[in-house]
UniProtKB/Swiss-Prot annotation:
The keyword Transmembrane applies. Belongs to the NqrDE/RnfAE family. This is Na(+)-translocating NADH-quinone reductase subunit E. Composed of six subunits; NqrA, NqrB, NqrC, NqrD, NqrE and NqrF.
Amino acid sequence: MEAYINLFIKSVFIENMALSFFLGMCTFIAVSKKIETAVGLGIAVVIVQTLTVPANNLIYTYLLKEGALSWAGLHDVDLSFIALMACIGVIAAMVQILEMVLDKFFPALYNALGIFLPLITVNCAILAGSLFMIERDYNFSESVVYGVGSGFGWALAITAMAGVREKLKYSDVPAGLRGLGITFISAGLMALGFMAFSGIQL
């Protein structure tokens, strides 16, 4: 149990997708103008990560990995070279399902997220979760914890960024830095804050 808690904390703080690896920055910057929208997208990312990382783990372990098709008598078959395409396909399917659910049951959130919901499909943070899982050879339960943790870490980062940007509206920012300029500086300072966790060994 301790190993799973350590993995969760590590994926949220020490190896934060947005502020340690700088993944998913397009949506991170674009959707962090309001806290409500940022929280909505953060929840969507947590759900997609929680579903796709374990799903890709099962597909990789039982179909794509070298020797995974031994149950079918194909002992020497190695399909790991199509792991990237398989991960993208699973992510696209999960996002499509999530989009239909939000459109049906949460139309306000669906309209608020707008074009950025389909962009979760090509959000590199989502894909990185599955690729890191394969690279680090996590088992199924570890991939569930890692999926939840990495999604929650990204959601935490975008929510914090939205809070900072809402406060910046009332600040006297120099004219040349207004808009994206001060946003990138704020993101960099937040990343420096998260660097404090990098020395922690779990």
